[in-house]
Amino acid sequence: MKRNVLLFISLCVVGCVMTYAQQMPGLLQKGKADTQDCKAWVDEQLSEMSLKEKIGQLFIHTVAPLQTQRNKNNIYAAIKEYKVGGLLFSSGQLSNQVLLTNYAQSLAEVPLFITFDGEWGLAMRLKGTPRFPRNRVLGCIQDNELLYEYGKEVARQCKEIGVQINFAPVADVDVNPRNPVINTRSFGGDPRNVAQKVVAYARGLEDGGVLSVCKHFPGHGDTEVDSHKALPVLNFDRARLDSIELFPFKEAVKAGLGGMMVGHLEVPELGKNPASISSHTVSYT
């Protein structure tokens, strides 16, 4: 069932190949994707897929936006051999990402998710794109409507280059000055303010037609270890977690936002395994 839902979202969101500077309607407009015809088409696609193809749809492959034959071969293999469900481009040139997006979509039998890690817009990864302040600065804005409009503008720019999912916003509460990886990526150290900014920005993204992904659940703000390199441990009781780390994520869930990224974090109070591989932490927290 979960695979069916994921593929349904993928097929409905990525309904066409998008090219630079195209003006497209919002891809997540309410009532547009949830139709009987669309569901029937998704069911038909699923019925024709092998188990390998269904598994491949659950993976997003990271590629560099480089116009090299080796890179194109990498993309070709990911799509044709492994049947991946989407791509995540790393840092590089805007024009290269657009060209490779169109190339990749032309290869895919099932339209691809094109994802992006743009916490403060395209300039976080792509050269020569509009620059916005980091989240720490945006967290000082008192009018949350501005965060909403900011999210819509980021969504507009994402759609112009064919991106349907942005791995943003950061929902971590930065309460540890020795944190080596979050700091200015966070909206600040006040859980309520962080939650308000997260919801406003993410709603702007989604109303603009781009799926938001709040991160890094259950909270990476009070760590002294970078989870890309090692396993941070959060030895806090449930009351502390509920009041700080988990608070913005719970508000995002209440707001009905579309996505959440699980961090590689060990939180003994929530489960014996790291959150990234703990169904209990993900499902029951």
Map each language-model feature to its residues.
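N-terminal hydrophobic targeting/anchoring segments and the immediately downstream early-domain regions
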Residues: 20-131
